[in-house]
Amino acid sequence: METKTFRATDAELHYAEGPPNGLPLVLLHGLTRDWRSFTVLLPEFVSRFHVFSLDLRGHGESGRVKDGYRVSAMAEDVKEFVQREIGSPTALFGHSLGAMVGMFAAAGNPNVSALIVGDSLLTPGNLAAMYDSIFSQLHRLLLRGGSEQDLARGIGTIEIHFPGISEAIRLEELPGNSGAVLREWARTAIRTDPECLRMTLDRSAHADWDPESILPSIACPVLLLQGNPDLDALLSDSDVALAKRLLPCAQHVRFPLLGHALFMQQAKPVLDEVLRFLAALQ
């Protein structure tokens, strides 16, 4: 894939583009991640689609914008990118924050032909259960400064609380959080503007979010990918019910063995569902 830049009205976006092998597919990563978050899916995607994997504003090598990290503002960047850089019907696949951005960008937008929502919250208050604590600790680590190695060690010591367990558990103690996984998170987190986390924590990032008005205006087919809420997934059962009520054309797949990370935890089941969904549209 070739890395490039795109100048939106309010921010410069860094992105990676694959060869024109099919339907344009824009990939939108989660908070404190970057375009490489989709690495495990890219070989299959690149062989089938014209892939554009973006760094959202404030992340990776994209530009910083003072007080400019509302999800709606990020979505405006994406809408401009699709209209000016691609210029033809485009599928969006967002994970976590990227999925919220995708929903905003798809609303009332005839240039979006399909939307994949990867374990995104619909109710920002859902962050309070676990992720507010994680993001608050990560925010403090970023403000403290230091090397990627220092940050990786710090991320490993972030404490989380699970229902029914009295003692806090450190991220490095959880299965799957190997040294390599923590180092990769540190690599992307250190390249994230800490203001993205602050605006998430104080909810100013979600100031314009109103699912009751946004979701009904998404006319394209939507695939909801839900992890298991008992395994730290953000998309709750009540949010799924809300989305299915409000979205004109929605499908839903639940992965009982996967948490919020979805494909970063296990690629194949997620890949299979995404390819099935997109194949039916072509």
Regions found by a protein language model. Name each.
Residues 115-154:
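Flexible "cap/lid" loop of the alpha/beta hydrolase fold
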Residues 16-64:
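Conserved HGGG/HGGXW glycine-rich cap/lid loop of the alpha/beta-hydrolase fold
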Residues 126-131, 148-216:
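Conserved alpha/beta-hydrolase catalytic His-Asp/Glu region
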Residues 88-131:
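Conserved hydrolase catalytic core segment
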Residues 1-25, 46-49, 86-88, 113, ...:
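Alpha/beta-hydrolase fold catalytic core
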Residues 53-97, 264, 272:
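Active-site loop/oxyanion-hole signature of alpha/beta-hydrolase fold enzymes
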Residues 217-258:
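Conserved loop-alpha-helix segment in the C-terminal half of the alpha/beta-hydrolase fold
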Residues 258-267:
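Catalytic histidine-centered segment of alpha/beta-hydrolase-like enzymes
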